Amino acid sequence: MKNVTDNLVINNDDLNIKSMKDLKNPVSYGKDTSADFKVQSPGNFKYENSKYEIKSDIIGDHFKSNMLGAVILALLNGIEIKDSLNAIESFAGVKRRIELIGISKGVLIYDDYGHHPTEMEATITALKQQTESKLYVVFQPHRYTRTMEYFSSFKDSLKLADFAIVTDIYPAGESPIPGISSKNFEEESIKYLKSIRYVPEYLSKKVQNGDIVLTLGAGDITLLGPKILKYLNEY
């Protein structure tokens, strides 16, 4: 792919990026007053004394931050801000990124590919902001090695939900590691269920009108959302 710009677009609010030295021609955005594109609130930014708003039905402040980065990159390559904003407004999103699977009895079912603590936290936080009711998260850890490395961070992310269910680890070709098990997540607000097939019936006894259910993971948990929806419709 041919490079048409020599600039580097950076999120000035990211401490990891700010700690990097010798960045070539950085163009920055963020809440920091030194940013080239100043973010006033999620989706609202100022550039060269003009104010702009990112309008999108896609849920999550982190997505709006990514969208702004794309707007800036497009501008550097000759595409006007207003044209990029119009394109974003008509963008319906992608599968498995806070994807609405359906609604049954007032319960909204979402699915997301998130399987790293940082993206899980962003997704859970985004959905928590959408409801005053309860958020139930069903998480299928992906790989034994990843579960071992990020166990504490996974648990912290899950605690952001009102209640979480963790199923057995999806191995993705890995062999089990002694002592690494989804059972280790279990506590008052986190329930361990061995298989995703037990989840629909279990959740049906807990969820109420207005609640949100989020399935999270990179394994076959993506098949669970429609099954939860079907179970709620039938029982």
List each model region and its residues.
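Acidic, Mg2+-coordinating active-site environments of NTP-dependent enzymes
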Residues: 1-109, 132, 183-188
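Short glycine-/acidic-enriched loop or helix-start segments at secondary-structure transitions
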Residues: 18-21, 38, 147-148, 175-176, ...
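Switch II (G3) loop of P-loop NTPases
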Residues: 109-115
